[in-house]
Structures are given as structure tokens and as C-alpha cells.
Amino acid sequence: MDGAVMEGPLFLQSQRFGTKRWRKTWAVLYPASPHGVARLEFFDHKGSSSGGGRGSSRRLDCKVIRLAECVSVAPVTVETPPEPGATAFRLDTAQRSHLLAADAPSSAAWVQTLCRNAFPKGSWTLAPTDNPPKLSALEMLENSLYSPTWEGSQFWVTVQRTEAAERCGLHGSYVLRVEAERLTLLTVGAQSQILEPLLSWPYTLLRRYGRDKVMFSFEAGRRCPSGPGTFTFQTAQGNDIFQAVETAIHRQKAQGKAGQGHDVLRADSHEGEVAEGKLPSPPGPQELLDSPPALYAEPLDSLRIAPCPSQDSLYSDPLDSTSAQAGEGVQRKKPLYWDLYEHAQQQLLKAKLTDPKEDPIYDEPEGLAPVPPQGLYDLPREPKDAWWCQARVKEEGYELPYNPATDDYAVPPPRSTKPLLAPKPQGPAFPEPGTATGSGIKSHNSALYSQVQKSGASGSWDCGLSRVGTDKTGVKSEGST
């Protein structure tokens, strides 16, 4: 079993359900040895670390802190200490930050012992608190241009897996440095030694940035060395990184505004020097127009159009204005609409003092404004031939009268249709007894043998048949001789 370098009571601050509270623990610091690594262990009470079985010790959620992962150990000031006279110190690792507290002498001893075991090869010293050394006769003045923005702004971060991080090959733990003009990502060696810079992102090329309780993230632009994309770093100091970046951006913005002010002053001074030197003014546009043409200014076969005098437009002057006389001498032509507002003010004053129904100044004179031609649909017309356009082919709706007694329409009862009987075949018609027979049947419309006649008094069985056959068909019957 390794021997402990230091042990004693320590207050550990924990946060659960949004509330922070101090919990008293028993801390034991073990140095690095062949049997184990340098570590700081926490227990509920004093007897938990010595002997006993494995089940006799009940440790907290934060069981062991490996000193190899320790980044910094520094005293801090807290608003609510766990007990009167206690001082706190912060122990930062690559994953999270721990806030510890003890009485003042024990807290200083803990910080010194932790630094000695966590940074054996580093150079660390504690600042003396009493009897500071007196300065020599040499006076020192602070430099107002010194900007310690990046000092103390190095944070241990762990790169989260994103598309941009995979494209740049970033994975694992790094150190993120917040500088005056950019964010720089530094690589870390095996012994937690900071190596050379790996990537940098200028503040002017960051689209947006933000933080969370456990991470810090920003979105890089297309012009960044890493290319566009979102980079997310897991850290417990996301709020500190966010504030440092925001402060650096505000300071850079203020410096940019100051630089713009210096540029304006330089431009003003340059203009003053030019004015004092009395440099010739550049030629005006009229001089350029009046200058003689060059030798090859126009092609040989080009035609020059003679300048024609400019004509005034129709409404260049108001109606009540008087044109200048030609014999008054040579005067420069006044610009167009030079007295427009003056006449308008006069007309407004005249309208207020006199009849308000006077015509406005910009009314067009008669005969000048063309009358627009009347279109086909200018005047509304009443529709005609409604009986033909709106006629209906058949009456719609109910055509039967309404019966209010039965609250229904007077529909007649359905009629029962009798089935039609099939026509009976017509048999031979027998004449009534006592009717005349013989040659009385000579109708050409009746068919042959349409009537059967009985024999007469002579008793001949084919009486009359031979005549009918002879008269009708011209063929002699069998009974004829």
C-alpha cells in the first residue's frame, strides 16, 4: 500500500438539482509510485481509507482525481464559504473543475502539495503575501498598450465529433487559447506539455459562437484555414471561454473604430496640404466639350451632326411666367425649373388670400392636352335581350301545387296499368244464315278462299267456286266439264 503524502478534511462543492452545497469529506493525496499513479481520493469519513474491507469504504461520486489530468491549482474567492475562516481553491482537470475548501493554513498547504505532485517538472512558485520586496530607485511605468487578453485564457478542451472536426482530423484533448485577434488550438504532449499551434480561427471570420454548461461551440466561415463548419469542444469552462471571446471581439471592434478615425484625420490633413499647395483645378465639363478634337478622334467616313439649338419643353415655365427679352443683352441661361418653387409659393399665398376655388398652377391649358379617345366600355350600359340571355329551357323545381294541410306536394296516386293481352288469331268468318250467296262476292281486295259458302238449292257441292276461280285466276276448276 502506498503511503499518503497528505490527508485531512476538505469541503467539496457539489451541484444537484440546480443548488450548490458544500459537503465535508476526508481527502487523501497519494504520490506517483510503481504501485499506482498520483491521485487524490475522497472518502466520507476518516476511517474509510485505512484497512477495512473493500465494502467498508463508501466513496463519493467524485471518487479519484488523477493528478496527471490536472491542469491548474489556484486559490479562489467564494461568496459563501462552508464555514467561517475557510478559504477555497480550484482544481481544474481536462474534463471538469472541482471547487475545494479548508481552513486558511490547510488550504495553502493543500495547494502547495498538489502543485508539487501534479507538476513535478514544472516551475511553480507561490506569490509572497507579506513583506513584499522594495523596489530600487529605478522607476517602472506600466505600458498602456499592453493587452494581456490571452494571458490566463488557455483552456483544456475535448473535441466533439462533428463533420468539420473529422475533416480536419481533430480528436482527443487540446488546449484552446483565446488571443487578441483569433482563437488558437494547441496540441498537447504526453506529459501535458503544450506544443505548437495546430489551427487558428480569426474573430472576423467566425459566423457565430455560443456556450453551454459543458461545452463551447462556434461556426467557422469559408475563409478560415479549417474551412467552414461547426466545432464543438467539451469543457466545464464554457462560460469563461465565451466571456473571453466576447471581450476580445469588443476590444478589436473598438480598435477598428479608432483606426478609422485616424484614417479620416489623415485624409483631412492631406486635403489641407493640397489646398495649401494651390494645385490647378481639373478642367470642367464645358472645357472638355469645347476642346478641339484630336487627329484620330473620329473615323474618316463618319458624319458630324451639326449641334441644333436646344428647344424648351412644353411645360418648362409656368403659365404666368414671362420669357426673357432678346435685347436685354447676353445672359447665361438659367437652369430648368429654377423658379418653380418660387411661383408655387406665390400661388399658394394667392390662393389663401383670395378665392380658394382658383385653378391650380399646374392645370393644362385648353387645347394642349390631347383628349384621350373614348373606348368601347367607357360608359356603362344596361343589359339588353335579357329574355334571350337568361331564358331557361325547362321549368326547374317542383311543378305540383303545395298542400299546406299535409305539408307536402299534392302528388296524385299512382295509376295501375293493366297488362296488354296478346291479340287472338282471326278465324274464318261464317256468314249468317239467310244471307245471299253466289256471285255477290266479287271483291278484288279479298284473298282467294277467304270466305266459305254453303251449297245452294241445286245441291251442287262446287256451286259458284268454278266462277270465282275462273274469274280470279282464269284456271278451270276440277268440277267443271
Swiss-Prot record:
InterPro entries (UniProt xref): Docking_Protein_DOK, Dok1/2/3_PTB, IRS_PTB, PH-like_dom_sf, PH_domain
Effect of Y362F: No association with NCK. No association with GAP
Domain of life: Eukaryota
Assembly description: Interacts with ABL1. Interacts with RasGAP and INPP5D/SHIP1. Interacts directly with phosphorylated ITGB3. Interacts with SRMS (via the SH2 and SH3 domains).
Chain ranges of the PH domain: 4-119
Limits of the IRS-type PTB domain: 151-259
Disulfide bonds: none
One cellular component (GO) term of this entry: nucleus
Domain remark text: The PTB domain mediates receptor interaction.
Keyword Acetylation: yes
Species for this entry: Homo sapiens
Name used for this protein in its record: Docking protein 1
